[in-house]
Amino acid sequence: MTLRPLHDKVILKREEVETRSAGGIVLTGSAATKSTRGKVIAVSTGRLLENGSVQALAVKAGDVVIFNEGYGVKSEKIDGEEVLILSENDILAIVE
């Protein structure tokens, strides 16, 4: 299945990071915190401005980003994999 985001939405896959405790134990499940880093897999055509024009988004497919996981972030399972759908405003930085 292919998703095509609308408005100013971005679809990304969370990048899992291995988390270790201070003693070197690998934390999993509820003991580990979820990563707020992800790889963009699809972006919309842009944000609709008040004057009717469309402003392209700053991120593109393939970018690795750091995002704010808050109220507006939607988690969905597509073809057995979790994807996140969020507004470009929820993206804090592009990792270069």
Swiss-Prot record:
Output the Gene Ontology terms for molecular function: ATP binding; metal ion binding; protein folding chaperone; protein-folding chaperone binding; unfolded protein binding
What GO CC terms are in its UniProt record?
A: cytoplasm
Please state which protein family the record places this protein in: Belongs to the GroES chaperonin family.
Q: Which NCBIfam families match?
A: PRK00364.1-1
Assembly and oligomerization: Heptamer of 7 subunits arranged in a ring. Interacts with the chaperonin GroEL.
**Free-text function comment from the UniProt entry:** Together with the chaperonin GroEL, plays an essential role in assisting protein folding. The GroEL-GroES system forms a nano-cage that allows encapsulation of the non-native substrate proteins and provides a physical environment optimized to promote and accelerate protein folding. GroES binds to the apical surface of the GroEL ring, thereby capping the opening of the GroEL channel.
Protein name (record):
Co-chaperonin GroES
Species of the source: Actinobacillus pleuropneumoniae serotype 3 (strain JL03)
